[in-house]
Amino acid sequence: MTWRETLCGVLVVVSTITASGVKAQEVRSDQDILMQLERDWDEAFHRKDVAVIENILADEFVVTYSDGSRADRSKELRLATEFDQQIDSSLLDEFVVKVYGDTAVVWFTQHLVGPSKGRSLALTFRYIDVFVMRAGRWQCVASQSTKVTST
């Protein structure tokens, strides 16, 4: 078999695989995974979906809220079930994600819009969350939010 025949055979196999719809497995970066975890957490909180949040938060999770109060995992989960403020929209943006081995830090901004006392209220918070990689998945161990008073 000549090199041309071999090349033609390889091209036929490659084009057959491509035409049959075989796709390479999509590989997501840690940055993409962490940003999606933040979005999943936000959506789950507003839906009161504690199961999703339980999978994201590590057992030793600690949060410092924008008023300076601090809470643990159990209180954060309880707050998710008690959440009763109507939210028209919650947008997360301005992500900065840094991965340091099995630790990652995620900074982002949250824009909330919803009714308050008959008027539309818009609030902005900046977050910093710390994640660790355990058993092949990212878990949040610490979070802090700061209310933005002016932009």
Ranges and model annotations:
Residues M1-W3:
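N-terminal secretory signal peptides that target proteins for export/translocation
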Residues C8-T18:
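Bacterial N-terminal signal peptides
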Residues A24-T151:
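A beta-strand edge to alpha-helix "cap/lid" segment located at domain peripheries
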